[in-house]
Amino acid sequence: MMKLFCLNIFRFLYTTSFISAVLSFNQRPINMQEVREPRLFELLAETRDCNIFSELIMQFPDYVHLFQQKDQHITVLVPNDAAFQQCKVKPWAIEYKNGVAVKSTDIVHITEQQAQDNILKFVERHIITSSPIEWNNEYKTIDGTDVHVIKKEEEIYINESIHVLCRKKASNGEMWVLNATLSTPSIRE
């Protein structure tokens, strides 16, 4: 009698779980969220080795807003943190004489406003207002710097010497992580 009772309970549970599975097959989960590509701002915020550039961007609300826009398609060239550590002259400490960046041999004395202007020029030198970028073409950044994109074998380079470490696609463009900065040409070594 006990065997029969256990067998009936097993059949009942098996049948109800089968019916439940069949009925739930056509149902959508209640909390199903639409998957979307992140925007450039989100990519920049979540990329671990690009904190310095990310902090520089945060100083300029117009560019933060640009990186959040859906309808903009831009390419941002992001030097990784190691690239900043290798800079001989930090972007905010560049001295300008007659509008031209020069490498000073003396200690540079610049005002806070000059430093902020230098950072803005630096950020603008790393933004191209088009995306996607095609190989073996030349582009202008927001500040007017010419950037030549080259693909050698499977590697991508900017101006023949700056290696693109990785490319990340966003819904509003692309983020390219670089191993060096696009420093001011007149002070490169």
UniProtKB/Swiss-Prot annotation:
FAS1 domain: residues covered: 37-182
Position of the signal peptide: 1-24
Superkingdom of the organism of origin: Eukaryota
Membrane topology: Peripheral membrane protein
Listed name of the protein: FAS1 domain-containing protein mug57
Role description: Has a role in sporulation.
A Pfam family matched in the record: Fasciclin
